[in-house]
Amino acid sequence: YGISPAATRVSGDERWLAEASTADAGPGMSAGGAASTPGRAAIGQQTDIYRFDITSPGPPRFVAGGRVPGYLIDQYALSEWHGYLRVATTTGTSWALADGPPADAQTSSSAVYALSTRGPVMRLAGHVTGLGRTERIYSVRFMGPVGYVVTFRQTDPLYTVDLSDPAQPRVRGSLALTGYSAYLHPASDTRLIGIGRQAD
């Protein structure tokens, strides 16, 4: 398929590949209602997601595709749960990814999307946007129906996103700390460990 994935994730008998894209949303690849940024010059303003079946010997079999706005930080920004793929992305050029303050730094923000995995096109079921305005995602972890998203610029807001209803995700709470967590690890169903750096 000639894909250079920004993130890859294996879930059971399936593999997910996410590739940063600047192309206009084409037929059969739209996230089904999620805002996109066609014609955008910045790298990674959209992410194409491909689902492959890896149960049989030989090459993986393409199953479905979808698209969401923004870019993924790593494989933990993807998670399948009960027929839905949860994806955490940042849109806008982050202040931390350019030399000096970018012109659109004030518009950068993050979001979590829930895509239905039924059918050849992954359609948008629901989303929550506006996380960490002027910031970018530093770490993500999904644990069952809950997603944890860390964004950072001067403080580290840890957002708790309730995804129990994929059609209506909502922010359940947030915790602001100095510094940021670059890695989140589930210690139990009720405990999350964050590893990162302290900020002055």
Model segments located where?
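Beta-sheet-rich non-transmembrane sensory/scaffold domains
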Residues: 1-200
